A protein has these predicted regions:
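Contiguous segments within soluble domain cores/interaction surfaces
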Residues: 32-187
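Secretory targeting signatures
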Residues: 1-34, 71
Length: 187
């Protein structure tokens, strides 16, 4: 074999082996989670384990009632919230998308207040500020981000997808988003 051909074979082998290793260690594969009443499993990002902490008040959501969601990601080793989190939230019911947007908090705890509007509007309005760096909604100091409009206005099961896209610094984008899927029941 010529020296040039040997280099091509070695390079190709390296690419194939690297692709296989990366395929087995994809953060999104480890972070995929289903939530059916119990917390989703921790996601592995490098040497860290991040746990989703999502709390809802009231815990039993009723149609057309308001609900406050508090969403944070806990670093298990430090037992503290991960700072500068950005995530995309997608809410759907029966395969129909209801809300999809990005949310951010510098301290790592996003509070979302859902208020159903009485009336005929089929869209939502979001009360908060746009963060220039992350292009995501952030809260006014001391207040939650408010989402007005029909979101949880029908009884049944809702799918909430969360794709974590930044951690630790507003400029630190994850190579692949960490995905969580949660089922929420509305009565």
């Amino acid at each position: 074999m010529t020296k040039c051909r040997m280099s091509v074979v070695v390079f190709t082998s390296f690419l194939l082996l690297g692709g296989i290793v990366v395929g087995f260690y994809s953060p999104s594969q480890e972070a995929m989670a289903q939530h059916h009443g119990a917390p989703p499993p921790a996601a592995a990002i490098e040497d860290r384990k991040l746990t989703l902490d999502m709390q809802m008040k009231p815990t039993n959501i009723t149609q057309s009632g308001g609900v406050l969601m508090t969403i944070a990601f806990l670093d298990e080793e430090k037992n503290a919230n991960v700072q500068h989190v950005t995530f995309r939230m997608d809410i759907s019911k029966d395969g129909k998308h209801i809300l999809s947007d990005f949310f951010h908090d510098h301290n790592g705890e996003v509070k979302l207040m859902f208020k159903d509007n009485e009336g005929d509007s089929s869209s939502q309005t979001i009360g908060g500020n746009q963060d220039v760096l992350t292009n995501a909604w952030i809260a006014d100091p001391g207040s939650p981000i408010t989402i007005r409009g029909p979101v949880f206005n029908q009884s049944g099961n809702y799918d909430i997808g969360l794709d974590l896209t930044t951690i630790d610094n507003d400029k630190t984008d994850l190579i692949e988003p960490v995905e969580y899927h949660l089922d929420v029941k509305v009565s």
